[in-house]
Amino acid sequence: MAAAAAVGPGLGSGPGDSPEGPEADAPERRRKAHGMLKLYYGLSEGEVAGHPAGPDPLDPTDLNGAHFDPEVYLDKLRRECPLAQLMDSETDMVRQIRALDSDMQTLVYENYNKFISATDTIRKMKNDFRKMEDEMDRLATNMAVITNFSARISATLQDRHERITKLAGVHALLRKLQFLFELPSRLTKCVELGAYGQAVRYQGRARAVLQQYQHLPSFRAIQDDCQVITARLAQQLRQRFREGCSGAPEQAECVELLLALGEPAEELCEEFLAHARGRLEEELSSLEAELGPSPPAPDVLEFTDRGGNGFVGGLCQVAAAYQELFAAQGPAGAEKLAAFAQELGGRYFALVERRLAQEQGGSDNSLLVRALDRFHRRLRAPGALLAAAGLSESATEIVERVARERLSHHLQGLKAAFLSSLTDVRQALAAPRLAGKEGPSLAELLANVASSILSHIKTSLASVHLFTAKEVSFSNKPYFRGEFCSQGVREGLIVGFIRSMCQTAQSFCDSPGEKGGATPPALLLLLSRLCLDYETATISYILTLTDEQFLVQDQSPVTPVSTLCAEARETARRLLTHYVKVQGLVISQMLRKSVETRDWLSTLEPRNVRAVMKRVVEDTTAIDVQVGLLYEEGVRKAQSSDSSKRTFSVYSSSRQQGRYAPSYTPSAPMDTNLLSNIQKLFSERIDVFSPVEFNKVSVLTGIIKISLKTLLECVRLRTFGRFGLQQVQVDCHFLQLYLWRFVADEELVHLLLDEVVASAALRCPDPVPMEPSVVEVICERG
């Protein structure tokens, strides 16, 4: 506001507002020139007058000062500013006041809502804690009542309990004595009936008593009879175990009974594992046979079901029976079982990985994830029983490896889909156009490529999201809750594909020799717009979608969205710059050939514009249409009203003196060169390969600069006759008539074409230009 208030009365008013009218134009121009010089040297009005600039801290008209006086300020405005400026100042102040008022209201409302939310939260917490305290009080009361009842019941039953216990002891002793006297007959009957377990239990119940009272004759006779019967029982059990025709539960029962009869545990342990190995190896052989080439392999879900029900189920039975039977073996027995499980488990895992490898080429993960879920779920039980064998960890590692391979597979699929989309675009661009039927436009091709890529990305995300579904048994593992989401899906798949897409797009900026073929300029333009769209919206959308679907619980660093957007923008800039160079070189090649293949010394008097200049205008117009399909117009400088009527008088200003002077001396060209060079010193430097902005005007400006600079350099290398110079004059005027409307600043076209004509004049021994009116007639006719 202070800047607006300090504006002097001369600013903001045009020539029509000055009371002096046209007489004030000259002083006005001088004031503007002085102002530009002061702006260039960084001087203010105070510094020009000889004293340092800066607002007076005691100035009552300084809006931002501590001593601001509104009455003095308004009085100064009324005295120094016209009505129009007063109204503009009022409008600006009202706008700023409203903006400040709106900001203050927004700030108050935001903080008010936060305070209300915090108050509600605290009130809710108080209510919850009050309810908890009431419930705890009721619980303490109930516990006290229960304790009181328990004490009263125990005191009432104490006397009766002692009498009942004494009678029960006498009764139990009588039953034991009766059992001992009947033991030999019971054992004999159990062996005859095949009730080996019952016989062993009878023997176990009586063994300690018989050992304790074997010095008594009656007990000694019972013990001798029992030992004979027990020896016969052990022989039958060993025969049954060694036959191996029964199942795992029956064999485990035999070992259990033999151990109960006192047989050596070490020998039984080795025999038990040997029999179990044979059965489990049969299961592995059947699984390996399913992987053979001759029969069609079952689907992966059926394969894992068979392995889980057969091998894993059998291993669980063996492990459970072994731990129950040989627990007394201690660490040595556990190590034997762990080594046994590791060996056979490793062979089973190898078969599973071979079968899973056959699924890596498929695009659907649903069946594969279900198979991995069942595989991992079935190995929970042996993993718990055989923690030392590490079966559960090995199964998890297999699942993680498969998940990584699927991510890599989907990344390659996305890359292939992107390349396929580019191939379709190239074919569409190269396809011949039928009469009366136009092919798809660049905008349609861009929309097709963008939608196709986005569709493939969403499909891949949905496919790999199955690995983190809640119903999947391994989804709660640390890898799938953290690294899989952040480093696998986000960084490896999505960020990796976006960077690969940018690298693939940048590879089209290589020279044709490196790529094996020229890239269509339209493809460069389309890719630049695609990368720019990714920078502005698509990357943020894709990463937000990924973060929402895969709730990352990993603290490892990830690529920021801003970094990816910067890479995509840089790729778009390189592609667009390369597009400008390619199109500029195409037009430059036409201009270069047209200059180098013509004999400019013996050319005839120009009657028409050369065809190559018409072709340049046509190609530039086509490029303008092509770029306009994908990029916005851009900002142009204000165009002069006579841009199409200019007839190149700049080159003649420094040469007409030498051309029409009565005495043409050898010093004249030197003077002409000197004047031309002095004029170049004060003209703006033209950067041919300046950075290209993302708009149509900037692209066309870059192409035209390259083309006209090439024309200028070619003209400097040729020698022209009088008519050759006039032909260059006609051609340049024709180009000026049409090219100025494509560039951001028409002065750029004028300067370059002026230099072309001036260079041709310098290379001409007899520089006689054509009359501007004749040039205009020829160009209008052409």
Swiss-Prot record:
Q: Which GO terms describe its cellular component?
A: cytosol; EARP complex; GARP complex; Golgi apparatus; membrane; nucleolus; recycling endosome; trans-Golgi network
Entry keywords, A to Z? Acetylation, Coiled coil, Endosome, Golgi apparatus, Lipid transport, Phosphoprotein, Protein transport, Transport
Residue numbers of N-acetylalanine PTMs: 2
Region Disordered, as annotated, extends over: 1-31
Where are residues bearing Phosphoserine located in the sequence? 18, 44, 649
Keyword check for RNA-binding, yes or no: no
The chain's coiled-coil residues are 116-148, 270-292
Location(s) in or outside the cell: Golgi apparatus, trans-Golgi network; Recycling endosome
Q: Name one GO biological process term.
A: brain morphogenesis
A Pfam family this protein belongs to?
VPS51_Exo84_N
InterPro entries, per database record: Cullin_repeat-like_dom_sf, Vps51
Disulfide bond positions:
none
Primary role: Acts as a component of the GARP complex that is involved in retrograde transport from early and late endosomes to the trans-Golgi network (TGN). The GARP complex is required for the maintenance of protein retrieval from endosomes to the TGN, acid hydrolase sorting, lysosome function, endosomal cholesterol traffic and autophagy. VPS51 participates in retrograde transport of acid hydrolase receptors, likely by promoting tethering and SNARE-dependent fusion of endosome-derived carriers to the TGN. Acts as a component of the EARP complex that is involved in endocytic recycling.
Provide the family line.
Answer: Belongs to the VPS51 family.
The UniProt subunit note reads as follows: Component of the Golgi-associated retrograde protein (GARP) complex, also called VFT (VPS fifty-three) complex, composed of VPS51, VPS52, VPS53 and VPS54. Component of the endosome-associated retrograde protein (EARP) complex, composed of VPS51, VPS52, VPS53 and VPS50/Syndetin. EIPR1 interacts with both EARP and GARP complexes and mediates the recruitment of the GARP complex to the trans-Golgi network. Interacts with STX6 (via N-terminus). Interacts with VPS50 and VPS54 in an EIPR1-independent manner.
Name listed for the protein in its UniProt record: Vacuolar protein sorting-associated protein 51 homolog
